[in-house]
Amino acid sequence: MENRCLPKKVPGFCSFRYGLAILLHFCNIVIMAQRVCLNLTMVAMVNKTEPPHLSNKSVAEMLDNVKNPVHSWSLDIQGLVLSSVFLGMVVIQVPVGYLSGAYPMEKIIGSSLFLSSVLSLLIPPAAQVGAALVIVCRVLQGIAQGAVSTGQHGIWVKWAPPLERGRLTSMTLSGFVMGPFIALLVSGFICDLLGWPMVFYIFGIVGCVLSLFWFILLFDDPNNHPYMSSSEKDYITSSLMQQVHSGRQSLPIKAMLKSLPLWAIILNSFAFIWSNNLLVTYTPTFISTTLHVNVRENGLLSSLPYLLAYICGIVAGQMSDFLLSRKIFSVVAVRKLFTTLGIFCPVIFVVCLLYLSYNFYSTVIFLTLANSTLSFSFCGQLINALDIAPRYYGFLKAVTALIGIFGGLISSTLAGLILNQDPEYAWHKNFFLMAGINVTCLAFYLLFAKGDIQDWAKETKTTRL
């Protein structure tokens, strides 16, 4: 085999691989904004206090209902509407993950982003028909968004040099926290000024425009890129020359099921999505019930955790690649470090939120820290599958996401039931359940996680020259 050396001078941030990371970053912002905006608009959409048969309204109130249609949905129906997006995501994970190992993902991602955006435009008229039609739209939106979030991982198998994986993936994944930040920040103002339907129209139009840019700018393989410099092409190709090519090959399912390092990743993905979904979905509700603020202030306060989470995600990417490139820590040590920070720190802060939040400021601080420190996982278990089985990364990412989404679906539904049945101690039950899951899964990860390619992922390999 020919020994190819890495080019001495390689384009850094101003390069096409970082351009791809930024483009995916914006895609993730949009799909998360489309997903999360309902968490806040629900406060404006639903009449929680006035029975529907009362009609003693002023002209101003009737005009406001034209701008802000109010629906009489019970707490159980609201929980179904909020969680229905995860039903769609469950359906699509494994098919897209399997296809990402054998087929180019750029068309699937672009089409799915466009579909999610069109469905966002349809939610306000669907709400006028009834909650059932909104649930249908959200399920279909979940299918489209699941294709975007899962399919993008297969792209990095061809584009991310090993020593830049933390940086590139954290830049991309940080869009998942910037999306809620933007959605919650602006949705309150839009609801107040223009009415809640405009939230869905604005994010839907932005997504449609971005999908057009996606089709114009993205190329699936760096070797086929017409404008990329030869030095960057050589750098990416040389960095990945020992990586197993992920074409159509049989999946070693039996070996995967016996792999403790893989189960460590799966369990912590479950814990991460359980925690993340609980906090993302119910932060506006927690703020509304504990701090008693209006919808605009709620949006501002709910968005704060995601600004800090965005910063934490970017910092984590820089730190992890620094520790690896300087050979300060091994790959497995870096993954365990950032998994611990991302899974255990939120536990500490939700417990503080329950027992040490004596006033408005302490509540906001602990809630912000609980949400934001989850982002350290971006450089932990969330990309660990790329270390242990790059050939099957797309498929494994889909499987871990599928099991994680079940956690998100269960956590959001269960939290709604607990809030409905036991309002006084609901937050204690929800947060302690989250803490127990996180600590158990983290302990398993610290015992069994690995950072090198596993034997079952090396079988019948074909080296890329």
UniProtKB/Swiss-Prot annotation:
It comes from the Eukaryota. It is a multi-pass membrane protein. SUPFAM superfamilies: MFS general substrate transporter. It holds the Pfam family MFS_1. The chain crosses the membrane at residues 79-99, 117-137, 176-196, 199-219, 260-280, 299-319, 337-357, 363-383, 399-419, 431-451. Keywords: Cell membrane, Glycoprotein, Ion transport, Membrane, Sodium, Sodium transport, Symport, Transmembrane, Transmembrane helix, Transport. Disulfide bonds: none annotated. PROSITE patterns: MFS (PS50850). GO terms for biological process: phosphate ion transmembrane transport; sodium-dependent phosphate transport; urate metabolic process; urate transport. GO terms for molecular function: sodium:phosphate symporter activity; transmembrane transporter activity. Belongs to the major facilitator superfamily. Sodium/anion cotransporter family. Important for the resorption of phosphate by the kidney. May be involved in actively transporting phosphate into cells via Na(+) cotransport in the renal brush border membrane. Plays a role in urate transport in the kidney. This is Sodium-dependent phosphate transport protein 1. The lineage of its organism: Eukaryota, Metazoa, Chordata, Craniata, Vertebrata. The gene is Slc17a1.
